[in-house]
Amino acid sequence: MRVLWVALVVTLLAGCRTEDEPGPPPEVHVWWEESKWQGSQPWEQALGRFWDYLRWVQSLSDQVQEELLSTKVTQELTELIEESMKEVKAYREELEAQLGPVTQETQARLSKELQAAQARVGADMEDVRNRLVLYRSEVHNMLGQTTEELRSRLASHLRNVRKRLVRDTEDLQKRLAVYQAGLREGAERSVSALRERLGPLVEQGRLRAATLSTRAGQPLRERAEAWGQKLRGRLEEMGSRTRDRLDEMRDELEEVRTKVEEQGSQLRLQAEAFQARLKGWFEPLVEDMRRQWAGLVERMQSAVSISSSTSAPSDNQ
């Protein structure tokens, strides 16, 4: 269970009765005040979580007291302290980064004071945690004995620590607010002074630029026109060369086409002559083969006729 040690502190400060001295329920006295560190800055919100953490423990029941000897409480408090100090340090570094408009001596003094205030707040929170650790050890050693005196001493010390922590936290908050206001005022003065110094220079620069523009406008236009004419002449020259080259390429292509047509005609004539020669070679062979084939067919027909005549008398017998 979270933050059980702080619950024990709350129970003690509430004046819980001991086992040996029963009596009416005492009035609960909260040793911390309502969370007042609910500002817009992250470090103020971190301190607010620390106070809310303690106030939440007050709502725990008495059944958790037997579990309060765990070290979980000190771990939780350590995390809250580290978170608070981290946020305070980040905000302090942010303010130091904004100390540009002030002198180096003032910047060093402000940084030193902020570090001292931060250290005091951190020491107060560490004191609360250390007192809880010490009380845990003493309670562990005094189990079965009366702890009324120990509770009274712890409650008194925690009240003193609470007052000191509240005072140091308020001091840190006031210092940060004063330094932030001073930084804003210094930055505004620096910006105003810079604007006053740069105003005449900007006006002079504007007038000089306008004068130079007026003086340089005419030569620039003349140079631009001359350059444009030169560019047009070069483009026309390149266009003429391109047209001449295209005409030459067209003539060369026409000449190549004529040569190709002549070579095609020659190839057709050569092919026709070769075809005629082949025809002259193969026609006698084809005619000879036709005569031989006709003779062969005629002999076969004669043989078939003779065979038919011979087989007919045999059938009659």
Curated annotation (Swiss-Prot):
One of its GO terms (cellular component) is extracellular matrix. Residues 265-317 are annotated as: Homooligomerization. Coiled coil: none annotated. InterPro entries: ApoA_E (IPR000074), Apolipoprotein_A1/A4/E (IPR050163). Keywords: Chylomicron, Endosome, Extracellular matrix, Glycoprotein, HDL, Heparin-binding, Lipid transport, Lipid-binding, Oxidation, Repeat, Secreted, Signal, Transport, VLDL. Sequence repeats lie at residues 79-100, 101-122, 123-144, 145-166, 167-188, 189-210, 211-232, 233-254. GO terms for molecular function: amyloid-beta binding; cholesterol transfer activity; heparan sulfate proteoglycan binding; heparin binding; identical protein binding; low-density lipoprotein particle receptor binding; phosphatidylcholine-sterol O-acyltransferase activator activity; phospholipid binding. Heparin binds at V161, R162, K163, R164, G228, Q229, K230, L231, R232, G233, R234, L235. One of its GO terms (biological process) is high-density lipoprotein particle assembly. Residues 157-167 are annotated as: LDL and other lipoprotein receptors binding. The modification Methionine sulfoxide is found at M142. Residues 277-289 are annotated as: Specificity for association with VLDL. Residues 209-289 are annotated as: Lipid-binding and lipoprotein association. Residues 79-254 are annotated as: 8 X 22 AA approximate tandem repeats. Residues 1-18 form the signal peptide. It is found in: Secreted; Secreted, Extracellular space; Secreted, Extracellular space, Extracellular matrix; Extracellular vesicle. APOE exists as multiple glycosylated and sialylated glycoforms within cells and in plasma. The extent of glycosylation and sialylation are tissue and context specific. Glycated in plasma VLDL. Pfam families: Apolipoprotein. APOE is an apolipoprotein, a protein associating with lipid particles, that mainly functions in lipoprotein-mediated lipid transport between organs via the plasma and interstitial fluids. APOE is a core component of plasma lipoproteins and is involved in their production, conversion and clearance. Apolipoproteins are amphipathic molecules that interact both with lipids of the lipoprotein particle core and the aqueous environment of the plasma. Belongs to the apolipoprotein A1/A4/E family. Homotetramer. May interact with ABCA1; functionally associated with ABCA1 in the biogenesis of HDLs. May interact with APP/A4 amyloid-beta peptide; the interaction is extremely stable in vitro but its physiological significance is unclear. May interact with MAPT. May interact with MAP2. In the cerebrospinal fluid, interacts with secreted SORL1. Interacts with PMEL; this allows the loading of PMEL luminal fragment on ILVs to induce fibril nucleation. This is Apolipoprotein E.
